[in-house]
């Protein structure tokens, strides 16, 4: 249990008064906004307390409209938030044209699509996908007594991506071939072949926690299965020869080994379920009755930390083709060091589908050279899918430079891109106020204490993620919370770039699965705390995390979006506490919570 060095009654009384003072002080903020020559007073802020009736401890909510409630696109010219989010170093997100991209992404029909059965997904992929999503569903609360009661519906990004990416290639067939000369027929055939083999480039951008992983997995897995089905229809011999061919068919590139492991585990789970094939179209029945299709039957491989590139060759030699390889760009470039293999990149010559996840990271200066060099080794590439939760301005510039013909880019963006889910409640805590008197760690300890006593997540281990800006801060904060505030060693860990990948995996395990029942936790923990940096702010699917704490503001709006997105995922509720002091306090921070509730876009 956490100790702050004060008796419980005294602590509760002090903190109640302190946080009430913080929230009350917000009412002194007002902002005048010029609208067509007239002045309009922004609404007064809302003030709340963080389950204080149950815990006896109040955590202040800084959701006032104040100086910065109008955040991002559409903010008034006179608002502080508009200046902060749309100019200067903090503002790094590209928002121009997003509404148009969402309109052209097929989302105008999203209200009519309520089931994956309405989307073009291969039958075995659809069933395995739904089973995998259900297996990771955070089943807490009274809504559902059993996972069988949960109906899995496609999210907006899944609808848009599947409708766009999984379209049949439109190839115009000339009607008057008989009337053409031999030369004209050859020209038409070449044009048709070029259209069939042309690389299509998709960008898929959607808010954090919206289901982007399955938005691209459903597409590439369906395409792989459709290709299998075509070989099967040719002849049994052709199909068996294809299965045993030593080739990699698709690749998923990610920036970190943690993300490689995460996507690999998702695919491994999907590949393990026995499939029942209800309501399968007649044309697929014979194909799906083959013994290898009792499960998804895909050959999956990963190259992560500790995995030698030579292992890929061994798997190809022993088991034939690899359907999906999950790795980092750096791992593929390391194939050039395989002196024992003649032409080591030849196994990638048959790759038809490539996903670049967290594309804004893999296209920044530190990764761009490796990423582009890797993709150049895929001469038969049909679909290149770039996936991201944010479109930073620099990423957009890189796309324009790499693909100057914008017609070659097929863009998919959801209406909520760069918006924070309304399921996330954002609260600000000012560490300069009494009783903290400038101590952000004491303010942090109080927030942890309040969360531990708030009565939520009944009978489950509560999990908290704390973000700091520098990796040098991680170990010091962990040590301080242990030594001064008596948090048990078993209940807290720190992860930064200096922690080896093996230890990271062990530390992350409690946060990457649904919350455990108190009685099942081997450490007898009531709370688990992870202290980290932006290393784990991107893409990590922290399942059912309800509480995130930011020790100050991140360095940019991009990092802010990703940190807030570690909670409130897949329509679940979450809370974020931002601890500020005079060094990091910005006038717009206290308005961030209400701006999120208004659906404002972060700029």
Swiss-Prot record:
The organelle targeting sequence, given as a residue range: 1-71
Broad class of the protein's primary localization: mitochondrion
Catalyzed reactions per annotation: ATP + H2O = ADP + phosphate + H(+)
UniProt GO molecular function: ATP binding; ATP hydrolysis activity; RNA binding; RNA helicase activity
Transmembrane parts of this sequence: none
Family matches, as CDD domains: DEADc_MRH4, SF2_C_DEAD
InterPro entries: DEAD/DEAH_box_helicase_dom (IPR011545), Helicase_ATP-bd (IPR014001), Helicase_C-like (IPR001650), P-loop_NTPase (IPR027417)
GO CC list: mitochondrion
All copies of domain Helicase ATP-binding, residue ranges: 193-409
Enzyme class: hydrolase
Domain notes: The Q motif is unique to and characteristic of the DEAD box family of RNA helicases and controls ATP binding and hydrolysis.
Task of the protein: ATP-binding RNA helicase involved in mitochondrial RNA metabolism. Required for maintenance of mitochondrial DNA.
Listed name of the protein: ATP-dependent RNA helicase MRH4, mitochondrial
Organism of provenance: Lodderomyces elongisporus (strain ATCC 11503 / CBS 2605 / JCM 1781 / NBRC 1676 / NRRL YB-4239)
